[in-house]
Amino acid sequence: MIWIAAAFFVTALILLLIHGRRHLRAGLPAGELVYLDVASEQPSVLVSRRYGLKGKPDALVRIPSGDVIPVERKKTRAPKRPYAGDLIQAAAYCVLVEEQYGRTPPFMRIQYTDRHFDEPYTIERKQWVLRTCQEIRQARQSGACDRSHAIPAKCRNCGQRANCDQAL
């Protein structure tokens, strides 16, 4: 009987270690995995009717404090500091998490291939997201949405190139 209990304990320990390694290897903070965007799962789109915002984070993790943290995973090496576009995307997920779960995430994680950044989610970042959303809405309404050609390679490789009247 003791051998069965010992075998059960060892098996549980091994499974726990495997799960923990996968969690860390995926670049996720310690905690309960609430959602992970993988092809086999239905997408978990978060919606804010209040702000007219939708988004699908790469992962959501409930950390030991009970807060839900959005994780944005990138397929590139980390810059010295997170790119502004990556920051605002992760901050937008924080706005969505805040509305969906009723708690403000203390930080957001941006995971690059070689390292991650845990960036604080502040009222200033929330205001940045909301201001940017408003600017986008105004630009769409006015029809003044010129494409950025600051990086010509992005234009050449864009999936909408064939439909774009501003392609290089």
Predicted regions span which residues?
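Conserved catalytic cores of phosphodiester-cleaving nucleases, focusing on short active-site segments
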Residues: 55-79, 89-95
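A short, polar/proline- and glycine-enriched secondary-structure boundary/capping micro-motif
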Residues: 80-84, 129-131
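Alpha-helix N-cap and loop-to-helix initiation/capping positions
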Residues: 84-85, 124
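A generic structural signal for short coil/turn motifs at secondary-structure boundaries
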Residues: 78-82, 118-120
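Active-site metal-binding core of divalent-cation-utilizing nuclease and nuclease-like domains
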Residues: 31-65
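Metal-dependent nuclease catalytic regions and adjoining charged, substrate-binding loops involved
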Residues: 44, 48-50, 99-168
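N-terminal signal-anchor transmembrane alpha helix of single-pass membrane proteins
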Residues: 1-30
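Metal-dependent nuclease catalytic cores in nucleic-acid-processing enzymes
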Residues: 85-107
